[in-house]
Structure formats: C-alpha cells, structure tokens
Amino acid sequence: VCSYVDDIYELAQALAKQDDITVIREKDYIKKPKENGYRSYHMIVSVPVFFSDQTKDMAVEVQIRTIAMDFWASLEHQLKYKKDIPNQQSIVDQLSRCAQQIASLDRQMYQVRRQIEMSEDLPTEEEILFEKLRRIDIATNE
C-alpha cells in the first residue's frame, strides 16, 4: 500500500528491475479500472523460494494500490458478500461513484504533495527509491 499513485508505478518498476524477480504478467486497473470501480496494479512475478535442499521459483501475485484504493477495495469486498439486498444495482452504482471520488482524492493528494515538494529541499530520486525499497524489505521481514 502506497501513499500516492505515482509511487505505485515507481514500486512496480523497482520490483521489475530486481535480479531475482521475473515479471510474468501485469494488469493496470488504475488506468483501466474494473467495471465496479476497482483500482489497483497487479503483478504476477516469479520469485525464488529457498528450501533446505533447493531453491524453487514460485509465482506470486503482488497488488499495489494507494491507501484510498485499499480502503475502497476492503469495504467493497466486505459489502459484496451481503446477500439478499433489495435494489442491488443502486448499491453497485453507489460503490462505483465512491471509487470515482476516491480516484479524484488520490489525484488531489498528489497535487498537494507536488506543491509541497516544489517549495522545499527534496531528497533525490535515488534516496526516495532507496527508502521505498527499505520499507518493502522491512514489510517482508515482519
């Protein structure tokens, strides 16, 4: 889960550049959201898994999204399992509108960040990427 949409693409690019990771497939549901409004970036990657006697490549799915996208996806997932709701199309329409509002919020937050970055001394792209990779390493080791 990332703070901003551009972080998603930077992270996906950084993962794809890893020597021990092979990208099998990518789906960009941010540029082409699902019909219900779902937005996220999916990658199927092959990663080495180390066993006591061998190393085996395994396919795993990585889903990268913003905090706002994750909020929507989590609630939509819970709500879609509620059965026997009258006027379900109304619910679907409302969820889709919420997804559009969240996408708009993501864009606005990105603009706020850019404004702030332009007014202060910024870390280099290399420093930003290193910090993102450090966070990934911490998250995978927890």
Which residue stretches match the model-derived regions?
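Intrinsically disordered, low-complexity acidic/polar and Pro/Ser/Thr-rich regulatory regions
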Residues: 108-142
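Long beta-strand-rich cores associated with HINT superfamily self-processing modules
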Residues: 1-109
